[in-house]
């Protein structure tokens, strides 16, 4: 199983609902590296790196998000892995 990198944009009610903190917790549980941040337009951006199956699981989680989120759309772009270490909230 290879290492993959996914670049996500998550839309809907995804700010002010604990999305970043919850994604960080899920990523650490799954052993996925990367980062997550809020964007000025109200969306959330994230980069996920890890084993394909684990990254796919976190993308699946992102379609639902934490309990108070209302995700309307998730865009995924696949990129070359860059060697992310840990999972952090960057903004």
From Swiss-Prot:
Keywords: Hydrolase
Disulfide pattern: none
Family affiliation: Belongs to the acylphosphatase family.
Catalyzed reactions: an acyl phosphate + H2O = a carboxylate + phosphate + H(+)
Any one GO molecular function term: acylphosphatase activity
Alphabetized Pfam families for the sequence: Acylphosphatase
Lineage: Archaea, Methanobacteriati, Methanobacteriota, Thermococci, Thermococcales
Entry keyword Cytoplasm: no
InterPro entries in the cross-refs: Acylphosphatase, Acylphosphatase-like_dom, Acylphosphatase-like_dom_sf, Acylphosphatase_CS
NCBIfam families: PRK14436.1 (NF011010), PRK14444.1 (NF011016)
Active-site positions on this chain: 20, 38
Acylphosphatase-like domain: residues covered: 5-91
EC number: 3.6.1.7
Organism in which the protein naturally occurs: Pyrococcus abyssi (strain GE5 / Orsay)
Protein name (record): Acylphosphatase
């Amino acid at each position: 199983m290879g290492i993959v990198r996914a670049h996500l944009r998550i839309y809907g009610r995804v700010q002010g609902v604990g999305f970043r903190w919850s994604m960080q917790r899920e990523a650490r549980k799954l052993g996925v590296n990367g980062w997550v941040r809020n964007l000025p337009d109200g969306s959330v951006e994230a980069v996920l790196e890890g084993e394909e199956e684990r990254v796919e699981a976190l993308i699946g989680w992102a379609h639902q998000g934490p309990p108070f989120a209302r995700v309307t759309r998730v865009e995924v772009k696949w990129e070359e892995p860059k060697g992310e270490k840990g999972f952090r909230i960057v903004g």
